[in-house]
């Protein structure tokens, strides 16, 4: 298994709407690497574009440990509906290290998605899992938590965001010069 590099705010792939996954043949290897990467970074969720992959795929483990079996895999997900009261909760993001913002989201979400075996499901999720699903679906649509808060909150982290953006541009230039 491999730990993949997590790309940060400022990398163009994070602002793209991710493509549907058509071929599930090698998906388990990618999923395994994504879980390794997420656990290494001490996250509870990870979208494929956060590791540089343009695909509608994300994983979640709200237990935050490798030992527990609370893993969730969502392929070609789309939000069918959002229900319940809006709730405010502090969210962080592996692509925006050091930044945590109070984000308002609906209490529950209904998601249509595929599993790695190709089966389609439509389920309702609430609590931390429901919130994490909404967060990761935002990633797959090019949306960050910073886009979900007001201007006053965004200004508080302006310096950190500019630094992340600058570092991402430098990393992309370096990779380009090396032929990646």
Go through the PLM ranges and name each one.
Residues 1-180:
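Positively charged
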């Amino acid at each position: 298994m491999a730990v993949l590099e997590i790309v940060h705010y400022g990398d163009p792939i994070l602002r793209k709407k991710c493509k549907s996954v058509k071929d599930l043949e090698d998906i388990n290897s990618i999923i395994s690497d994504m879980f390794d990467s997420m656990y290494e970074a001490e996250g509870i969720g990870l979208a494929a574009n956060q590791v540089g992959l343009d695909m509608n795929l994300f994983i979640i483990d709200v237990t935050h440990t490798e030992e527990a079996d609370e893993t969730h895999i969502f392929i070609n997900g789309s939000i069918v509906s959002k229900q319940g009261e809006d709730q405010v909760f502090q969210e962080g993001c592996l692509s925006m290290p050091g930044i945590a913002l109070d984000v308002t989201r609906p209490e529950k979400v209904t998601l249509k998605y595929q599993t790695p075996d190709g089966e389609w499901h439509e389920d309702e999720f609430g609590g931390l899992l429901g919130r994490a699903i909404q967060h990761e679906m935002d990633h797959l649509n090019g949306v960050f938590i910073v886009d979900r808060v007001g201007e006053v909150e965004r200004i508080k982290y302006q310096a950190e965001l500019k630094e992340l953006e600058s570092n991402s541009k430098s990393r992309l230039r370096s990779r380009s010069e090396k032929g990646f």
